Amino acid sequence: MAAGEEAPSILLPAVYDIVWSAVVFVVLLVVIWKYALPRVYAMLDGRTEAIAGGIEKAERAQAEADAAKAELTAQLVEARAEAGRIREQARVDASVIAAEIKEQATADAARITASGTQQIEAERQQAVVSLRSEVGSLAIDLASGVIGQSLADDQRSTALVDRFLADLEASETAGRTGSAS
């Protein structure tokens, strides 16, 4: 080695290496800056817009879901209130119908009782009339046989039978009143 030349340093590279390395670094920096970086920024902007759009869409969907939930809650409250009104109206209607049916049944029972009473009274009157005529005929026949004369006069025999039956009824009524006391 010559005295004027120095030995290359291990830590410090040669000047031409530094210059060429700086030129290549600047060229790569310009290429990245000019071509790659705009594409990366465009891709990042697209992703940012997509994420922001997704967040906005999710917020709108959440707002719609909250509105739908509030509407459904209101409808549920209204439906429960309507069901309560319907139940109450059904109770009122049932009590009205039950009262009407009870009133109708009472009226029907009274009508049937009155009809039965009238029918029994009519049959009793018919039986009394029938028995009077038969008893009268038998009494006249019996009296005719006992006294040996004919009691053919209808008016006189009818009056006799009626008087006899009236006396019989009066004695029966007196007997009932006396035994009841």
Curated annotation (Swiss-Prot):
Pfam families per the UniProt record, alphabetical: ATP-synt_B (PF00430)
Subcellular location: Cell membrane
Main location class: membrane
Membrane topology: Single-pass membrane protein
A GO-annotated cellular component: proton-transporting ATP synthase complex
Organism superkingdom: Bacteria
Molecular function (Gene Ontology), one example: proton-transporting ATP synthase activity, rotational mechanism
Record key words, sorted: ATP synthesis, Cell membrane, CF(0), Hydrogen ion transport, Ion transport, Membrane, Transmembrane, Transmembrane helix, Transport
SUPFAM superfamilies the UniProt entry points to: F1F0 ATP synthase subunit B, membrane domain
Residue stretches spanning the membrane: 12-32
Family of this protein: Belongs to the ATPase B chain family.
Subunit structure as annotated in this protein's UniProt entry: F-type ATPases have 2 components, F(1) - the catalytic core - and F(0) - the membrane proton channel. F(1) has five subunits: alpha(3), beta(3), gamma(1), delta(1), epsilon(1). F(0) has three main subunits: a(1), b(2) and c(10-14). The alpha and beta chains form an alternating ring which encloses part of the gamma chain. F(1) is attached to F(0) by a central stalk formed by the gamma and epsilon chains, while a peripheral stalk is formed by the delta and b chains.
Function statement: F(1)F(0) ATP synthase produces ATP from ADP in the presence of a proton or sodium gradient. F-type ATPases consist of two structural domains, F(1) containing the extramembraneous catalytic core and F(0) containing the membrane proton channel, linked together by a central stalk and a peripheral stalk. During catalysis, ATP synthesis in the catalytic domain of F(1) is coupled via a rotary mechanism of the central stalk subunits to proton translocation. Component of the F(0) channel, it forms part of the peripheral stalk, linking F(1) to F(0).
Protein name in UniProt: ATP synthase subunit b
